[in-house]
């Protein structure tokens, strides 16, 4: 290490000390750039790390899960499977709906993925059913990502079908056009339609069939081109009354003649205005409603998107009748803004605490002002670089700046303390600034680059976790770099002009008391250090025991992935027996809603029943529970969830699964609980054999709670077993049978009514009110070869069987997903290990594969790379220190301080009841960079004393420890108080910030005590080792 000799003229700081105007203007430029940058920074909950995800939904009313899988999902999957950059493809095929979710690699732009999906859909079109009502529709949205905003549209005066028609046309479409919106859905499905309910007995009495009626309706309602007449002088467009617009028009439609008399549709059917799908319903606080869910595109800024929607809502609602009310039930940005505000407050508090510590140690207002200027200047200047890198103001970048508060003041403190020491010896302020800054310049550079070296591995973390912490690491590194620049330029210049012997010597009663206290502390430390140096092997034993303890604590501490946040919104799934109908589910949701709304923490509730792209089966319902603001309720979200589940548990025939919404969404499907684990096979039969066994085994594990699976193979099904020979003899084809059944029971969309603003469907079905259940099949009649009609029972036998309610695929193979939570007292790491052990115990065959999904999969990947990440940070720091010191030995002395930080952090986490998650791991990595600065300051001065004053290694390190004790204590306390607001945070988003603060405060407390004694002993040990090596190998020269 090159140390500037006494009498140096300031080194890199000289120019800035001697040119105060230029220095001031340079700092003003940094400040101005930061202020301007801050105004352009967007606000977000977390850095944008979403996987490019696209959802493809295909609706085919009346189709069974098996038909949806084979006729719709499989052809689409074959085409999607050929797309480049596809990371994972999952699908869910249920009665009448197919949902395929495509997750692409992080590096693939969403627009490129969109083009590939559209091309794949086009290629699969010819393979899809010809009577598919609508082609597959894709949306740039992750279905597992909760809506950024939920609105309820209600009316006391208008039917819900009319309300939805207006809202869909006037509101939903406009919101869909907002930049960042990926999908707007109207839950409840009350789209207007003309419903034709055939009276099977009346139709049969007239010798007609449902197919006859369908053909008559489709032929009577058309909307096609008719041409034009082009004469010598005039052109005439041809038009006709080929469309029927209302239920009355259809009611008067003649469908046949009997004995010369017309038979109108109204004679054999009930024709009415109704909903397109009568098996869909949504409620807001138990009142029927159209619930509008707004989801963002992956990567879109949630705050900017929600602000745009809020701005246009008043204008959109003005176009609606006064009886239609639009209410914002939930807005995720409310909690995001509150969380950011709390973090900003903690940042300001950290700055105030750090400045207070500086004044406590320096007891001089001018000396306090100097670092008081350096801290905000370094932090504000960081905003300019953040804008350039397309970062945002989010919880992680604000946490980085809060932690940086303790870092950036370190450099200024070290410079001020060294310059003040020379002024107190009688040097002139300018000479002291030149000499002190020149002497300390290399130390500042060592501190800065060794700390940045710790952050380098974070930049190379892969997948979504790496993307998540890149903004954190870069923001912190930029703040540290700017701090170093400020400390080598502005700080010594201000010292030269603001400090003097008079100001430093001026003391009041408080200053003298503090000085006496510090003198006593330093004296006590000196006596303790002398004893430690006289018993080096005992000290080394303590250091070695600390290393072993850190390894043991690392093994036993509970491990998690990402803190569970309280964002004030709970997602729920209500599960009922597999044979449940829509009517029974609607009744059950009313009972559950009544219990939930009685809870004092609940502000509003939306529920949805029915099968669409969001809800897979009739025996399940979706819930969104919006809680009161955190300061208006007594309990956190997990306590509210426990209370709600207890309240609902007494309702027979239902199971309620609840989980809090999170800002970080890695999953690709809505799950009942927080964590997922999949079981995949080549056939459904293999799944049906192993799913019950594995589920029973998982439910018996104490490390898991609320274990469930989406495997539902006990749905009731009526199997129509057609005697093909009998049917052929009567001239009846299988297509005739399918059409007759579809016409009767499929809510078949048989025709379209076109208007200037929208399109509406004509729905055909049998009126089954008088013949419920399987008896309705006896009313089905088919047309035979001779024109007569025969009952279905003449050619078919009806069997009652069990069938799957939904069929799920993962990468084109059958799969079932197990969902689970982790009970109190256990960690996600415990749960994962228990599942892996259970797999081994069951000895699953080779054709059965298992895989963790979503956050559980990310946890496994992060856990596997954590140790290597810490090793990489240590190696990077060793390389940087080795280059700076031109030594192989001294970096090891400095790095010997690291186990103390690990022990302190892990002990603090265990005592606080926190898991070792990725936030806490980042804290430990930062500690690696912080605690080594104590050793750097000691060793720098010890080496200087050895080389310049000829001191012995023992005397040099002893003097260095006493000389640098005050700045070491000051900088450590500054870093500790910078992290303290995070550790003590209680507001919105505190779950995210607290592990970082706990790890850093615990690590700093323990390392501060131990390293002050272990570092000098290890320094002397390696000094003796170096002399031994030189004596054994005289030709080997090592500049230690």
Curated annotation (Swiss-Prot):
Compartments in which it is found: Cell inner membrane
Keyword Glycosyltransferase attached: no
Keywords linked to the UniProt accession: Cell inner membrane, Cell membrane, Membrane, Transmembrane, Transmembrane helix, Transport
Pfam families, sorted: ACR_tran (PF00873)
Primary site of residence: membrane
Residues spanning the membrane: 25-45, 347-367, 369-389, 396-416, 440-460, 472-492, 537-557, 863-883, 888-908, 910-930, 968-988, 998-1018
Record's keyword annotation contains Transport: yes
Superkingdom of the organism of origin: Bacteria
A single MF term (Gene Ontology): xenobiotic transmembrane transporter activity
Membrane topology summary: Multi-pass membrane protein
Annotated GO CC locations: plasma membrane
SUPFAM superfamilies cross-referenced by the UniProt entry: Multidrug efflux transporter AcrB pore domain, PN1, PN2, PC1 and PC2 subdomains (SSF82693), Multidrug efflux transporter AcrB TolC docking domain, DN and DC subdomains (SSF82714), Multidrug efflux transporter AcrB transmembrane domain (SSF82866)
InterPro entries xrefs: AcrB_DN_DC_subdom, Acrflvin-R, Multidrug-R_MdtB
Family per record: Belongs to the resistance-nodulation-cell division (RND) (TC 2.A.6) family. MdtB subfamily.
Oligomeric and partner information: Part of a tripartite efflux system composed of MdtA, MdtB and MdtC. MdtB forms a heteromultimer with MdtC.
Protein name per its UniProtKB record: Multidrug resistance protein MdtB
């Amino acid at each position: 290490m090159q140390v500037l000799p006494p009498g140096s003229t300031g080194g890199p700081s000289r120019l800035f000390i001697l040119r105060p105007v230029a220095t001031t203007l340079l700092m003003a430029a940094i400040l101005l750039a930061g202020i301007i940058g801050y105004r352009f920074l967007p606000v977000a909950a977390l850095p944008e790390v979403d996987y490019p995800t696209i959802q493809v939904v295909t609706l085919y009313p009346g189709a069974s899960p098996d038909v949806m899988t084979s006729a719709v999902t499989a052809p689409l999957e074959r085409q999607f499977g050929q797309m480049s950059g596809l990371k994972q493809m999952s699908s869910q095929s249920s009665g009448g709906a197919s949902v395929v979710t495509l997750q692409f690699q992080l590096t693939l732009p969403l627009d490129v993925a969109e083009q590939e999906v559209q091309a794949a859909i086009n290629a699969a079109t010819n393979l899809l059913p010809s009577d598919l009502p609508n082609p597959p529709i894709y949306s740039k949205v992750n279905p597992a990502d909760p809506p950024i905003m939920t609105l309820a549209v209600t009316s006391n005066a208008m039917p819900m079908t009319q309300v939805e028609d207006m809202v869909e046309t006037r509101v939903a479409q406009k919101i869909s056009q907002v930049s960042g919106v990926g999908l707007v859905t109207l839950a409840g499905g009350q789209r207007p339609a003309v419903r034709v309910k055939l009276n099977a007995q009346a139709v049969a009495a007239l010798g007609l069939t449902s197919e006859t009626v369908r053909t008559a309706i489709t032929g009577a309602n058309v909307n096609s081109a008719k041409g034009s007449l082009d004469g010598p002088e005039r052109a005439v467009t041809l038009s006709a009354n080929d469309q029927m617009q209302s239920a009355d028009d259809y009611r008067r439609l003649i469908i046949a003649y009997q004995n010369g008399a017309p038979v109108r549709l109204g004679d054999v059917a009930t024709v009415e205005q109704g909903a397109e799908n009568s098996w869909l319903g949504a409620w807001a606080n138990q009142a029927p409603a159209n619930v509008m869910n707004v989801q963002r595109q992956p990567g879109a800024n949630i705050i900017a998107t929600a602000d745009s929607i809020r701005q246009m809502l008043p204008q959109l609602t003005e176009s609606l009748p006064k009886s239609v009310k639009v209410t914002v039930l939930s807005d995720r940005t409310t909690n995001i803004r509150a969380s950011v505000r709390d973090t900003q407050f903690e940042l300001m508090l950290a700055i105030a605490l750090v400045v207070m510590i500086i004044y406590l140690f320096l007891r001089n207002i001018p000396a306090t002002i100097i670092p008081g200027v350096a801290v905000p200047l370094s932090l504000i200047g960081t905003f300019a670089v953040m804008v350039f890198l397309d970062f945002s103001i989010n919880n992680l970048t604000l946490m980085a700046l809060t932690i940086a508060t303790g870092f950036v003041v370190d450099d200024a403190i070290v410079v001020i303390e060294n310059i003040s020491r020379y002024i107190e010896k009688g040097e002139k302020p300018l000479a002291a600034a030149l000499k002190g800054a020149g002497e300390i310049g290399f130390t500042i550079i060592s501190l800065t680059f060794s700390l940045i070296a710790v952050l380098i591995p974070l930049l190379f973390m892969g997948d979504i976790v790496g993307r998540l912490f890149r903004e954190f690491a870069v923001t912190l590194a930029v703040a540290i770099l700017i701090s170093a620049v400020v400390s080598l330029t502005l700080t010594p210049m201000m010292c030269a002009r603001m400090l003097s012997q008079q100001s430093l010597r001026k003391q009041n009663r408080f200053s003298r008391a503090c000085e006496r206290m510090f003198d006593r502390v330093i004296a006590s430390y000196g006596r303790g250090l002398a004893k430690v140096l006289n018993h080096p092997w005992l000290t080394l034993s303590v250091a070695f025991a600390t290393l072993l303890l850190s390894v043991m604590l690392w093994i036993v501490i509970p491990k998690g992935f990402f803190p569970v946040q309280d964002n004030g919104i709970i997602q729920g799934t209500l599960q009922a027996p597999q044979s449940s109908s829509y009517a029974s589910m609607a009744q059950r949701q009313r009972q559950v809603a009544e219990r939930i709304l009685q809870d004092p923490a609940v502000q509003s509730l939306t529920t949805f029943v029915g099968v669409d792209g969001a809800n897979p089966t009739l025996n399940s319902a979706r819930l969104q529970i919006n809680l009161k603001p955190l300061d208006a309720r007594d309990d956190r979200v997990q306590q509210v969830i426990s209370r709600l589940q207890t309240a609902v548990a007494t309702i027979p025939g239902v199971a309620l699964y609840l989980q809090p919404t999170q800002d970080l969404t890695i999953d690709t499907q809505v799950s009942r609980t927080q964590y997922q684990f999949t079981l995949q096979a080549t056939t459904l039969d293999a799944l049906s054999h192993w799913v019950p066994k594995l589920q029973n085994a998982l439910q018996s594990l104490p490390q898991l709670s609320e274990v469930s699976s989406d495997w539902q193979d006990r749905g009731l099904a009526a199997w129509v077993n057609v005697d093909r020979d009998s049917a052929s003899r009567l001239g009846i084809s299988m297509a005739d049978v399918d059409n007759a059944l579809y016409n009767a029971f499929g809510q078949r969309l048989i025709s379209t009514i076109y208007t200037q603003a929208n399109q509406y469907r004509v729905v055909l079905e049998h009126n089954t009110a008088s013949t419920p259940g399987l008896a309705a099949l006896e009313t089905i009649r088919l047309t035979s070869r001779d024109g007569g009609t025969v009952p279905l029972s003449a050619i078919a036998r009806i069997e009652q069987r069990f069938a799957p309610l939904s069929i799920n695929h993962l990468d084109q193979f059958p799969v079932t997903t197990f969902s689970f939570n982790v009970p109190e007292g256990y960690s996600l790491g415990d749960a994962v290990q228990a599942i892996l052990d259970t797999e081994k115990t069951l000895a699953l065959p080779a054709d059965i594969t298992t895989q963790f999904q979503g956050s559980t999969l990310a946890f496994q990947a992060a856990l596997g790379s954590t140790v290597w990440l810490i090793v990489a940070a240590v190696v990077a720091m060793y390389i940087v220190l080795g280059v700076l010191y031109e030594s192989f030995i001294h970096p090891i002395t400095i790095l010997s301080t690291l186990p103390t930080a690990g022990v302190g952090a892990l002990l603090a986490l265990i005592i606080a009841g926190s898991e070792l998650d990725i936030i806490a791991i980042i804290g430990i990595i930062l500690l690696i960079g912080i605690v080594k600065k104590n050793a750097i300051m000691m060793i720098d001065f010890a080496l200087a004393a050895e080389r310049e004053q000829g001191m012995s290694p023992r005397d040099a390190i002893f003097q260095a420890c006493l000389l640098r004790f005050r700045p070491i204590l000051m900088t450590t306390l500054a870093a500790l108080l910078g992290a303290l607001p995070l550790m003590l945070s209680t507001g919105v988003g505190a779950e995210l910030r607290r592990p970082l603060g706990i790890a850093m405060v615990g690590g700093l407390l323990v390392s501060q005590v131990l390293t002050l004694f272990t570092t000098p002993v290890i320094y002397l040990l390696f000094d003796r080792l170096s002399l031994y090596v030189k004596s054994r190998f005289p030709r080997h020269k090592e500049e230690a």
